C-alpha cells in the first residue's frame, strides 16, 4: 500500500482510479482494460506531480524528506556496494544498531561505508531507534574511521537522522562528548570523506558524521540545526508555525547550496526518491564516482587542508576569503596582553622577581 502526504490528495485519487481501470474485474462482469483512459490518467498524474514538486515550500520538503517509503541507508548500502562486511561495537559499552558501518567495495576499490538507518517497518524502526544514534554509535564510527585512515581507505557516510538520541542513558554515557570527538575525528582524517544527506540531517547527530570533504544532499533532503517543530516551539511557543520556522531556517538543499554549506545536489525523480528507486540509485552512484575521483591524485595533507578550508570558508565574507589563498594557515591573532603574559613567564629572572615581590607582600601583610 502506497503512502501519500497531505498535499498529494489529487495524486492519490488519480492513482486509485488507474488501479481500478487496470483491473477489469472491478467492473460489472468482464470487460477490456481501457488503455487509452489509463494513459490519459497517467499523463495527468505526471503533470500534477510536476506542478506540486516544482513548487514545494520548505515544510513540504521536510515532509518529503521524512516520507515513510523514502529509500534508507540500508537500501543504498545493499545496492551500491559489494562485499559489505558490517562491523559492530565501540569497544567501550556496546553496539548501536541505529548506524550501519563496515568495509565494502565500490567500483572495485575498498571504502568504509557508514549509514544512519531509520528502519522501514515498526519493528525495525524500534530496533534502529528511528535513526537516533547513541554515544556508542559515534564511538564505533570513530574507531572505524581511524582504521580507514590508517589503511588509506575513503569514507562514505549516508546521513539520515532527526538528531542524536537525547535519552538519559545516552547523556550519562557522554553523548555530547561522543559527538564532539566524532567531529574532531572527521576533521583530522587524511583520506577523502563524502557525506550524503539522503533524508533528514538533524543537528549534531548529523554534523558528527558530515564534517566531510564533500557534503552532498538529495534534492528533497533537509539539513538543519533543529527540526522546524522544535524551532517553532522554542521561538514562538507554537508548534503550528512550522512553515514559518522552516522558511527561516533555510534547510532545503537549494538554500544550503546557495549558502555554500553543501557542495552538490543530487536530483531526485519527480515526486521524490521513493517513486523511482533505480533512478535515484544511479544518480547517487554517479555522484560518488565523480567526487571520489576528484581526490584520487591528492596527498593526505592536501585532502586534510581541502576539508579544513571548506569549513573555514563557510560564513566568511567574500572580501575576507579573497585575501587568503590557503585558509588552513589561518590562526587567531593574540592580544598584546596575552603575548606579554606568555613572554613574561618564559624568563627565569622575571619569575624570580615575581617570587620576591610575593614574599615581600606576604611579609608586610603578616607584620601588620
Curated annotation (Swiss-Prot):
Pathway terms, separated by semicolons: Lipid metabolism; malonyl-CoA biosynthesis; malonyl-CoA from acetyl-CoA: step 1/1
Q: Which GO terms describe its cellular component?
A: acetyl-CoA carboxylase complex
Q: Which SUPFAM superfamilies match?
A: ClpP/crotonase
| Top-rank taxon, per record | Bacteria
> A Gene Ontology MF term for this entry?
ATP binding
- Alphabetical keyword list: ATP-binding, Cytoplasm, Fatty acid biosynthesis, Fatty acid metabolism, Lipid biosynthesis, Lipid metabolism, Nucleotide-binding, Transferase
Q: How does it assemble?
A: Acetyl-CoA carboxylase is a heterohexamer composed of biotin carboxyl carrier protein (AccB), biotin carboxylase (AccC) and two subunits each of ACCase subunit alpha (AccA) and ACCase subunit beta (AccD).
Role this protein plays: Component of the acetyl coenzyme A carboxylase (ACC) complex. First, biotin carboxylase catalyzes the carboxylation of biotin on its carrier protein (BCCP) and then the CO(2) group is transferred by the carboxyltransferase to acetyl-CoA to form malonyl-CoA.
Which family does the record assign?
Belongs to the AccA family.
Descriptive protein name: Acetyl-coenzyme A carboxylase carboxyl transferase subunit alpha
- Species for this entry: Pelagibacter ubique (strain HTCC1062)
Amino acid at each position: 500500500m502506497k503512502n501519500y502526504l497531505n498535499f498529494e490528495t489529487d495524486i492519490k485519487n488519480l492513482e486509485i482510479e488507474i488501479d481500478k481501470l487496470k483491473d477489469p474485474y472491478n467492473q460489472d462482469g468482464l470487460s477490456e482494460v481501457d488503455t487509452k483512459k489509463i494513459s490519459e490518467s497517467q499523463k495527468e498524474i505526471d503533470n500534477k506531480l510536476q506542478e506540486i514538486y516544482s513548487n514545494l515550500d520548505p515544510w513540504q520538503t521536510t515532509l518529503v524528506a521524512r516520507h515513510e517509503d523514502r529509500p534508507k541507508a540500508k537500501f543504498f548500502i545493499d545496492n551500491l556496494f559489494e562485499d559489505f562486511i558490517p562491523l559492530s561495537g565501540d569497544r567501550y559499552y556496546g553496539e548501536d544498531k541505529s548506524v550501519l558501518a563496515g568495509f565494502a567495495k565500490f567500483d572495485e576499490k575498498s571504502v568504509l561505508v557508514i549509514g544512519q538507518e531509520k528502519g522501514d517497518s515498526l519493528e525495525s524502526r524500534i530496533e534502529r531507534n528511528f535513526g537516533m544514534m547513541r554515544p556508542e554509535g559515534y564511538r564505533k564510527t570513530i574507531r572505524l574511521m581511524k582504521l580507514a585512515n590508517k589503511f588509506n581507505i575513503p569514507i562514505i557516510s549516508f546521513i539520515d537522522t532527526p538528531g542524536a538520541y537525547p535519552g538519559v542513558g545516552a547523556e550519562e554515557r557522554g553523548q555530547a562528548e561522543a559527538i564532539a570527538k566524532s567531529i574532531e575525528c572527521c576533521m583530522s582524517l587524511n583520506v577523502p570523506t563524502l557525506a550524503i544527506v539522503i533524508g533528514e540531517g538533524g543537528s549534531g547527530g548529523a554534523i558528527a558524521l558530515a564534517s566531510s570533504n564533500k557534503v552532498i544532499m538529495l534534492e528533497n533532503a533537509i539539513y538543519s540545526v533543529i527540526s522546524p517543530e522544535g524551532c517553532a516551539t522554542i521561538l514562538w511557543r507554537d508548534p503550528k508555525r512550522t512553515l514559518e520556522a522552516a522558511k527561516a531556517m533555510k534547510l532545503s538543499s537549494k538554500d544550503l547550496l546557495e549558502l555554500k554549506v553543501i557542495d552538490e545536489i543530487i536530483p531526485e525523480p519527480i515526486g521524490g526518491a521513493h517513486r523511482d528507486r533505480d533512478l535515484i540509485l544511479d544518480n547517487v552512484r554517479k555522484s560518488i564516482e565523480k567526487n571520489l575521483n576528484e581526490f584520487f591524485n591528492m596527498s593526505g595533507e592536501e585532502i586534510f587542508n581541502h576539508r579544513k578550508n571548506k569549513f573555514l570558508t563557510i560564513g566568511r565574507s567574500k572580501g575576507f576569503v579573497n585575501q587568503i589563498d590557503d585558509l588552513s594557515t589561518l590562526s587567531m591573532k593574540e592580544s598584546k596582553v596575552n603575548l606579554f603574559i606568555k613572554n613574561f613567564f618564559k624568563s627565569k629572572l622575571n619569575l624570580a622577581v615575581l617570587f620576591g615581590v610575593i614574599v615581600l607582600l606576604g611579609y608586610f601583610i603578616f607584620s601588620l
